[in-house]
Amino acid sequence: MTKSELVAQLATRFPQLVLKDADFAVKTMLDAMSEALANGHRIEIRGFGSFGLNRRPSRVGRNPKSGEKVLVPEKYVPHFKPGKELRERVDRRAGEPLKAEDPDDDL
């Protein structure tokens, strides 16, 4: 599902929301989450999962063109850990055959 599909589904599910307002709501939520992660905070959405940061230590890598050793500095990368309810919901559907995505399935 893309951001635009999420906006469309939100506007469909809540007819009182204009598409523009649904887009604003999704953008605001994603901006707030991005800002929280950028500031080193953890985000927890009960039943869905949590977003946090994992530290990747510095290491010695290789330049693929020249083969020269280069130092890759440490960095922090976003990480998502699914919650129990989400894991169970996905697991229940794991035995079903995959089908083409239909945006109306989740309504």
From Swiss-Prot:
GO terms (BP aspect): DNA recombination; regulation of DNA-templated transcription; regulation of translation
InterPro entries linked to this entry: Hist_DNA-bd, IHF-like_DNA-bd_dom_sf, IHF_beta
Record field: compositional bias (Basic and acidic residues): 82-101
Keyword Transcription: yes
Stretches the record annotates as Disordered: 82-107
Function: This protein is one of the two subunits of integration host factor, a specific DNA-binding protein that functions in genetic recombination as well as in transcriptional and translational control.
Tagged with keyword Transcription regulation: yes
Source species of the chain: Paraburkholderia xenovorans (strain LB400)
Stated family: Belongs to the bacterial histone-like protein family.
Upper lineage: Bacteria, Pseudomonadati, Pseudomonadota, Betaproteobacteria, Burkholderiales
Source organism superkingdom: Bacteria
Keyword annotations from UniProtKB, A to Z: DNA recombination, DNA-binding, Transcription, Transcription regulation, Translation regulation
A Gene Ontology cellular-component term: chromosome
Subunit structure: Heterodimer of an alpha and a beta chain.
Full protein name: Integration host factor subunit beta
SMART domains on file: BHL
Gene3D superfamilies xrefs: IHF-like DNA-binding proteins
Entry GO MF terms: DNA binding; structural constituent of chromatin
